[in-house]
């Protein structure tokens, strides 16, 4: 389909004018800013039971140069090679092609091949959901970062489109990095993104659709005045990235946005104001800062309703609203968030609970999940969250299988009215369209130390809802419970038995349980003497292969009076997304089984507690594959 470049002179009454708009045409080359102009910018930037034996999990642990250093330091994405605590790479495993083929997911979004990382600029436009993503078109390892592009009618079935942006200008020649979309009231789309310049300086750039009437947004124009932002004095040239979606400021026609950075070891969110997205003013102070959290990247900032169950547009503010601040911590590759109050006039966000401040309190996901990004979906009035699920195997294994990383299933995000401290994340309702037939329903009484096989047609693609009722007499005896100060990550996994746990579900296991991934609850005695519930995912025996991540992930999760212990699991071959208590605590597992593959995968429920009986109620749906393929552009 031939498209024409959006012409502001003929559309001024409909769309926001962009200064110095290029003439019509497909991806026309932009004028390169002069060396003097670049120099000025750079000068400004300077200033169980017997079968579950106890095994310890493996632990994972600025000057210009001719080539960039490790991407975990300079590019703001995770180092790929999995390393142990000594820093040495693990020995590669002799993967068969059948094993590697089985690892590829059936209903999670991923490109046909090669490397992918952060989700970028998600939006809804003219009947289509758009997802852009960091992509290497040349290899299954990080490099040559380009913006991949895909569209969907339902967030589940996807169609690949041509690249939206490639690194072809001096200001993004070393990578078209992460960015966000802002949709103006008149429909114009402003896409701000970070570019890595020919001198390895992180700058912010503007792009916009060539033709807003095109539902697929096939062609994008880079503003010829790029970069629109360079690192301000006091900010490192490699510590200035990932602009957020903008929100309306206190003055009419004013927009605000935040960009992550650091000052020393303090993570900060800088705030800029603009009226046209081509010129910006850095506001005094910062939106928020937390000492000791290091570089903040992929910052997200959005409102949530404390009264209603719908999502809110990014600019919404007023009574009954809290604001979520999320930062992806470059130092440990974890996504942290906090809920607080935003003072628009003072440009300050304050956490409701300083002990749960951003970077030191709650995490969006306690597993392999990073660089998340939300957007407001006007079609269904919801806030939708994307996140990157990376790899923990070796680069050689990724090169052998020809791809690396997937995106999480999109999640809705709501404020948890019951706790007032947590968000509730839940898979978008469209995932249920993949359910095949009626669920398998089981109710199982589990005595201490017991395990039971649940027979399903295929254990590789499942949607599981499970609730557990613990013997009330045992719960009342919590004063006798052990493991005060229990932690999932240091507990020894599901093989570590206590009076009131662990109990839960075992997924992607083989018949002999030589490979298994338990997802479970563990009730311990808190520091106040009351029951404290933990939600964990144990990967210590998820694979017999060396050189892959085998941590125990998890955290505490509030279980309120009258609530059963409940979980939902989405199993998709080598990915398990686990949601506890309606999504208060979430864990994403990336596993690499060698035996529990194809028809050998099994599903179990278990109770490895020593002093409590548990009744498990389970619903299991088999899921069919999503349709993810190239868009038939020749049919347009």
Swiss-Prot record:
Residues 1-31 are cytoplasmic. The keyword Transmembrane helix applies. PROSITE patterns: GLYCOSYL_HYDROL_F32 (PS00609). One of its GO terms (biological process) is sucrose metabolic process. Pathway: Glycan biosynthesis; sucrose metabolism. The keyword Acetylation does not apply. PANTHER family: BETA-FRUCTOFURANOSIDASE, INSOLUBLE ISOENZYME CWINV1-RELATED. This is Acid beta-fructofuranosidase. The gene is TIV1.
């Amino acid at each position: 389909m031939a498209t024409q470049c959006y012409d502001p002179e003929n559309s001024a009454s409909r769309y926001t004018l962009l200064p110095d708009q290029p003439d019509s045409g497909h991806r026309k080359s932009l004028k390169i800013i002069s060396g003097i102009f670049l120099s000025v910018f750079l000068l400004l930037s300077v200033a169980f039971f017997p079968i579950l034996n106890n095994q310890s999990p493996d632990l994972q642990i600025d000057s210009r140069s001719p080539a960039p250093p490790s991407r975990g330091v300079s590019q703001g994405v995770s180092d790929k090679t999995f390393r142990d605590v000594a820093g040495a790479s693990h020995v590669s495993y002799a993967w068969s092609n059948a094993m590697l083929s089985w690892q590829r997911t059936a209903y999670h979004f991923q490109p046909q091949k090669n490397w992918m990382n952060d989700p970028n600029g998600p939006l809804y436009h003219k009947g289509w959901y758009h997802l852009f993503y960091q992509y290497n078109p040349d290899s299954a390892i990080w490099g040559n970062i380009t913006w991949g592009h895909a569209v969907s009618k339902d967030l589940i079935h996807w169609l690949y489109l041509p690249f939206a942006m490639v690194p072809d200008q001096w200001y993004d020649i070393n990578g078209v990095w992460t960015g966000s979309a802002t949709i103006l009231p008149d429909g114009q789309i402003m896409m701000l993104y970070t570019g890595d310049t020919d001198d390895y300086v992180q700058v912010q750039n503007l792009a916009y659709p060539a033709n807003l009437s095109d539902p697929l947004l096939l062609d994008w124009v880079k503003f010829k005045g790029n970069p629109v932002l360079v690192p301000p004095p006091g900010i490192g040239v490699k510590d200035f990235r990932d602009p957020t979606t903008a929100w309306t400021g206190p003055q009419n026609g004013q927009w605000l946005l935040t960009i992550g950075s650091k000052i020393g070891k303090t993570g900060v969110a800088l705030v800029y104001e603009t009226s046209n997205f081509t010129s910006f003013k850095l506001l005094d102070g910062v939106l928020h800062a937390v000492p000791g959290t290091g570089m903040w990247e992929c910052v997200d900032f959005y409102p949530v309703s404390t009264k209603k169950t719908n999502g809110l547009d990014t600019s919404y503010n007023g009574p009954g609203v809290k604001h979520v601040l999320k930062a992806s911590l470059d130092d440990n590759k974890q996504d942290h968030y906090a809920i607080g109050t935003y003072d628009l006039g003072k440009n300050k966000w304050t956490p409701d609970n300083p002990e749960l401040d951003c970077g030191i309190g709650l995490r969006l996901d306690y597993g392999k999940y990073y660089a998340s990004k939300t957007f407001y979906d006007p079609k269904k009035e919801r806030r939708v969250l994307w996140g990157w699920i990376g790899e923990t195997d070796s680069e050689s294994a990724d090169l052998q299988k020809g791809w690396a990383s997937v995106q999480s299933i999109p999640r809705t995000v709501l404020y948890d009215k019951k706790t007032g401290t947590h968000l509730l994340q839940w898979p978008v309702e469209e995932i249920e369209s993949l359910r095949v037939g009626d669920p398998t329903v089981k109710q199982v009484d589990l005595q201490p130390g017991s395990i039971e096989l649940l027979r399903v047609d295929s254990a590789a693609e499942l949607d599981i809802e499970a609730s557990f009722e613990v013997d009330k007499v045992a719960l009342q005896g919590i004063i006798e419970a052990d493991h005060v100060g229990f932690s999932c990550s240091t507990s020894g996994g599901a093989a570590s038995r206590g009076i009131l746990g662990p109990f839960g579900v075992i997924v992607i296991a083989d018949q002999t349980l030589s490979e298994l991934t338990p997802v479970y609850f563990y009730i311990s005695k808190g520091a106040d003497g009351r029951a404290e519930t933990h939600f964990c995912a144990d990967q210590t025996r998820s694979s017999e292969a060396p050189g892959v991540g085998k941590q125990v992930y998890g955290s505490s999760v509030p279980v309120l009076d009258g609530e059963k212990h409940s979980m939902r699991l989405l199993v998709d071959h080598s990915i398990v997304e686990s949601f506890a208590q309606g999504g208060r605590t979430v864990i994403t597992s990336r596993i690499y089984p060698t035996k529990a593959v194809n028809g050998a995968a099994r599903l179990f429920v278990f109770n490895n507690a020593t002093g409590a009986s548990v009744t498990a109620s389970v619903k299991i749906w088999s899921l069919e594959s999503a349709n993810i393929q190239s868009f038939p552009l020749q049919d347009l």
